[in-house]
């Protein structure tokens, strides 16, 4: 008989809201956090480009089951557009492909913004993670291929011009939905204004439902490595985690008893009839004694588990 496998890390669950520094990739950040926490598994809720800084929510352990609910949330970015150059990557990293001596006035910039608010059609950048015929667009672009990426609808809830520090740049804030490319906004601004443009600075300040104040700088986490006692170090790190349920705050919440929790963990539905039961059919999550038990569907007076938590 083979021996049972030992877990490769601690069975912790929670969210760390990392303030990612510039020149640090999202995958690299996840690996670093997983190692620091000695976690069994980890994953992030939305890539941030290496040249971008700011909020990168990282799920540890069972919290990785809640990643899709954060991926779909609203996001807020502050970004700077530099005028006069369009680049292959639509940011500072790429080669210049088009240039112009023209510069827009502040009023000209303000005049175009209403056209970018609401549900708009957007073509993702050539260097993006979009799949074309089974391959990532950025892989094809690196091989020198010019590819036709179909446009898609994205939601822009708010778009504000914050400042024009000089004739060559403008600073914006945007609140947007899933799948929006800020680099594509900069590209399209430049084309409409007839001066070309690219993102020269990008910071994400909000990923629903996590507030900006929840962010933890990477340097603060690394500093905890100086704690020699491993138990003390891990306790200090764990104190920075946000409860897994926080990612589900947009869903109806069922508070259940121990018997119901046992049924759900066995994969069985439970009855939710009663005065406090949600009326409409919907997705929901259930907790017992303050602990997340399951995410599931409510329908026909039952809660049916889809994802069960240890």
UniProtKB/Swiss-Prot annotation:
Top-rank taxon: Bacteria
Swiss-Prot/TrEMBL catalytic activity: uridine(55) in tRNA = pseudouridine(55) in tRNA
Keywords: Isomerase, tRNA processing
Residues forming the catalytic site: 49
Function: Responsible for synthesis of pseudouridine from uracil-55 in the psi GC loop of transfer RNAs.
Family assignment from sequence similarity: Belongs to the pseudouridine synthase TruB family. Type 1 subfamily.
Protein name: tRNA pseudouridine synthase B
Organism of derivation: Rhizobium johnstonii (strain DSM 114642 / LMG 32736 / 3841) (Rhizobium leguminosarum bv. viciae)
